């Protein structure tokens, strides 16, 4: 939402504690994102490039990964409140709005709020909507969730195929 047109993508997300994430986009174009602690690699096979960089030091950017992995106390990174208008998700559970903390100057904040919907029986995250200050909304819906499947560390290691250009990204930090 908020973009000139709605962009849809699908894929598979893998998480492992502590601080490991792999996101394989399948549609519309294949991409792979790897996160290990503060290191990020984004591989775009179509362009034969991998972008290598660091997560920002802003709490608003690190907290979603910690949230997905259950590593952080929500109160450390967010002010929790019911979603506006008392909206409810599937099963009647209230949606939760998370307002980022830790950004001293509001002008530097890129995320206005994150809205969460949890599955009624398991309390596993079902939907995460990231509302940006500029009005854009990125909504992630999780289906076919499997927990404690014993993912191997190698799944989160990326080695660029031969001929792939490695590009060092600028540090994603406030000016």
What are these regions (language model features)?
Residues 1, 24-26, 43-45, 99-101, ...:
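A generic structural motif
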Residues 1-3, 14:
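A short, Trp-centered hydrophobic/proline-enriched beta-strand micro-motif
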Residues 4-6, 121:
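Edge/loop elements at the starts and ends of beta-strands within beta-rich repeat scaffolds
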Residues 7-9, 17, 27, 74, ...:
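Residues that act as N-cap/strand-start positions at coil-to-secondary-structure junctions
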Residues 12-63, 138-139:
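An acidic-aromatic
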Residues 59-75:
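Short, solvent-exposed helix-to-loop capping segments enriched in aromatics
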Residues 73-163, 167-168:
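Gly/Pro-enriched, hydrophobic low-complexity segments
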Residues 173-175:
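Short, solvent-exposed mixed-charge patches
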């Amino acid at each position: 939402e908020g973009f000139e047109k709605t962009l849809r993508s699908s894929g598979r997300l893998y998480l492992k504690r502590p601080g490991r994430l792999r996101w394989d986009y399948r549609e519309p174009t294949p991409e792979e994102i790897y996160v290990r602690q503060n290191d990020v690699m984004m591989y775009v096979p179509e362009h034969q490039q991998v972008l290598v960089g660091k997560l920002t030091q802003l709490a608003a950017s690190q907290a979603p990964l910690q949230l997905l992995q259950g590593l952080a106390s929500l109160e450390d990174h967010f002010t929790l409140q019911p979603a506006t208008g008392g909206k409810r998700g599937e099963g009647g559970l209230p949606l939760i709005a998370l307002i980022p903390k830790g950004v001293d100057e509001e002008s530097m904040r890129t995320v206005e709020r994150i809205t969460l919907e949890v599955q009624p029986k398991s309390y596993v995250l079902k939907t995460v909507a990231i509302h940006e200050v500029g009005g854009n909304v990125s909504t992630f819906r999780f289906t076919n969730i499997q927990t404690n499947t014993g993912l191997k560390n190698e799944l989160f290691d990326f080695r660029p195929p031969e001929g792939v250009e490695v590009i060092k990204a600028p540090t994603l930090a406030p000016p």
